[in-house]
């Protein structure tokens, strides 16, 4: 290895910079172009500020078209309040007395 001038900053050392500039391309060759390209393109790591996505707001006149739903009555227990056993017996009795079917 060649001796490096100690007065040079580390990012200006020979061989520290690639000969070609970085591009926006994401092909395999460009992803392995340099360490920065590998980290940002290959691994997808970026430490820049994240852009806040703006919510798509509805037009102001869209509120007119919304119809308020009527309040539903409180839930009532469905089925026979006497219990499942008695209701089964009741159904059996009705089927016995109904000769139509």
From Swiss-Prot:
Residue numbers binding Zn(2+) 1: 22, 33-34, 37
Region of interest (Interaction with the host capping enzyme RNGTT), residue spans: 49-86
A Pfam family of this chain: Tat
Region described as Interaction with human CREBBP: spans on this chain: 1-24
Modified positions (N6-acetyllysine) in chain numbering: 28, 50-51
Primary location group: host cell
Compartmental location: Host nucleus, Host nucleolus; Host cytoplasm; Secreted
Keyword annotations: Acetylation, Activator, AIDS, Apoptosis, Host cytoplasm, Host nucleus, Host-virus interaction, Inhibition of host innate immune response by virus, Inhibition of host interferon signaling pathway by virus, Interferon antiviral system evasion, Isopeptide bond, Metal-binding, Methylation, Modulation of host chromatin by virus, Modulation of host PP1 activity by virus, Phosphoprotein, RNA-binding, Secreted, Transcription, Transcription regulation, Ubl conjugation, Viral immunoevasion, Zinc
Gene Ontology annotations of biological process type: DNA-templated transcription; positive regulation of transcription elongation by RNA polymerase II; positive regulation of viral transcription; symbiont-mediated perturbation of host chromatin organization; symbiont-mediated suppression of host innate immune response; symbiont-mediated suppression of host translation initiation; symbiont-mediated suppression of host type I interferon-mediated signaling pathway
Any one Gene Ontology cellular component term annotated for this protein: extracellular region
Region: Cysteine-rich, residue numbers: 22-37
Site entry: Essential for Tat translocation through the endosomal membrane: 11
Post-translational modification: Asymmetrical arginine methylation by host PRMT6 seems to diminish the transactivation capacity of Tat and affects the interaction with host CCNT1. Acetylation by EP300, CREBBP, GCN5L2/GCN5 and PCAF regulates the transactivation activity of Tat. EP300-mediated acetylation of Lys-50 promotes dissociation of Tat from the TAR RNA through the competitive binding to PCAF's bromodomain. In addition, the non-acetylated Tat's N-terminus can also interact with PCAF. PCAF-mediated acetylation of Lys-28 enhances Tat's binding to CCNT1. Lys-50 is deacetylated by SIRT1.
PTM annotation (Asymmetric dimethylarginine): residues: 52-53
Biased composition (Basic residues): 48-57
Basic and acidic residues: compositionally biased ranges: 83-101
Residue ranges, annotated region (Disordered): 48-101
Gene Ontology MF annotations: actinin binding; cyclin binding; metal ion binding; protein domain specific binding; protein serine/threonine phosphatase inhibitor activity; RNA-binding transcription regulator activity; trans-activation response element binding
Region of interest: Core: 38-48
Residues reported to bind Zn(2+) 2: 25, 27, 30
Domain notes from UniProt: The cell attachment site mediates the interaction with ITGAV/ITGB3 and ITGA5/ITGB1 integrins, leading to vascular cell migration and invasion. This interaction also provides endothelial cells with the adhesion signal they require to grow in response to mitogens. The Cys-rich region may bind 2 zinc ions. This region is involved in binding to KAT5.
Other facts: HIV-1 lineages are divided in three main groups, M (for Major), O (for Outlier), and N (for New, or Non-M, Non-O). The vast majority of strains found worldwide belong to the group M. Group O seems to be endemic to and largely confined to Cameroon and neighboring countries in West Central Africa, where these viruses represent a small minority of HIV-1 strains. The group N is represented by a limited number of isolates from Cameroonian persons. The group M is further subdivided in 9 clades or subtypes (A to D, F to H, J and K).
Subunit structure: Interacts with host CCNT1. Associates with the P-TEFb complex composed at least of Tat, P-TEFb (CDK9 and CCNT1), TAR RNA, RNA Pol II. Recruits the HATs CREBBP, TAF1/TFIID, EP300, PCAF and GCN5L2. Interacts with host KAT5/Tip60; this interaction targets the latter to degradation. Interacts with the host deacetylase SIRT1. Interacts with host capping enzyme RNGTT; this interaction stimulates RNGTT. Binds to host KDR, and to the host integrins ITGAV/ITGB3 and ITGA5/ITGB1. Interacts with host KPNB1/importin beta-1 without previous binding to KPNA1/importin alpha-1. Interacts with EIF2AK2.
Similarity annotation: Belongs to the lentiviruses Tat family.
Protein name (database record): Protein Tat
Organism annotation: Human immunodeficiency virus type 1 group M subtype B (isolate SF162) (HIV-1)
Species classification: Viruses, Riboviria, Pararnavirae, Artverviricota, Revtraviricetes
